[in-house]
């Protein structure tokens, strides 16, 4: 959990990152190493060394692929734009970031200590995130006006989206 003092306003940003996942099990390699199908395969997948039908040790790394990365999710809101935020959310599969105002209202955004949609998109681009959803829109925007925020964000980060309350967003594994 990231909590940083930015311009005398406490800002909460959260990053949740899964641990790496085991590599994929290769049944063909297990058969070639004379490990019979069944409970021994499960033990190998759990990281245990097993004996094959010849009484030889077979190690998990002999039948498991490379570790696979977990997913990373970041959430940033109620803050002024700071380029350093990008480092905190770097490589996220999903960034949920406030985009309270359109570019024309940047002075008002600074005064109220919020970001524009373009500033949120700049963070997403600089952090090399996979996907970004905007949140925390100013109440001045009706549903018909929100696409303007999206358009400004997508000019910088094409994978920007608008999010809504109670919206479910899937974060798929990369592999």
What are these regions (language model features)?
Residues 1-75, 79-88, 94-96:
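Active-site-proximal loop/helix segment associated with metal-binding centers of metalloenzymes
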């Amino acid at each position: 959990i990231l909590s940083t003092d930015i311009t005398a306003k406490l800002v909460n940003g959260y990053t949740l990152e899964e641990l790496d996942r085991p590599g994929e099990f290769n049944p063909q390699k297990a058969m070639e190493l004379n490990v019979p199908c069944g409970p021994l395969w499960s033990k190998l997948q759990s990281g245990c060394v097993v004996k094959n039908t010849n009484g030889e040790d077979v190690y998990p790394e002999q039948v498991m692929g490379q570790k696979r990365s977990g997913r990373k999710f970041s959430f940033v809101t109620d803050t002024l734009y700071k380029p350093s935020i990008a480092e905190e959310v770097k490589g996220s599969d999903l960034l949920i970031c406030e985009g309270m105002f359109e570019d024309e209202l940047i002075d008002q955004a600074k005064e109220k200590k919020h970001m524009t949609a373009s500033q949120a998109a700049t963070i997403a681009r600089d952090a090399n995130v996979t996907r970004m959803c905007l949140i925390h829109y100013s109440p001045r925007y009706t549903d018909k006006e929100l696409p303007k925020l999206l358009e400004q964000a997508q000019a910088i980060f094409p994978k920007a989206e608008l999010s809504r309350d109670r919206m479910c967003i899937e974060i798929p594994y990369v592999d």
